[in-house]
Amino acid sequence: MKSLLILLLALHPVFAQDAHHEGVVKRGDNVMGFSHEKTTHHFELLKDGGLIRADADNPNDVESRDQIRMHMQHIASMFSSGNFNAPMLIHEKTPPGVPTMKRLRKVIQYRIEPTPTGAEVRISTANSQALEAVHQFLRFQIEDHQTGDSEAVR
């Protein structure tokens, strides 16, 4: 019995992490307007910023593709104005980097680009503080969405 209790206590962080990720997915579906089960997210760190990308898993799923494009347009517009409510709602906390990204919003550019099955938001800046904040934000996204993307700058 004692061994079972020790095992359960050791596994508690794993269960808590899984429950948190399930919450991120569920809240994300509501906030973004498309299903995580039908789409794939990617986050990339670049020398001058980064990328937020989402694509429909099925190339014929035009509904998901169009919802992704609409969401990415909203993200680019909201982030440009310093509004980061969507990530805060999805993750239930302020992601790292957001306070600095809000403060330095005038030196960060957000450009949406359609992809064949979705869209991406290209984030760029020449400001070193803003760049560090963007990278913190994207690393958090990679971890919280469990995308498996590299956290290295390319």
Where would I find each of the regions flagged by the language model?
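Intrinsically disordered, low-complexity terminal tails/loops enriched in metal-binding residues
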Residues: 16-154
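Generic structural signal for short, solvent-exposed loop/turn connectors between secondary structure elements
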Residues: 1-3, 17
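Sec-dependent N-terminal signal peptides
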Residues: 3-12
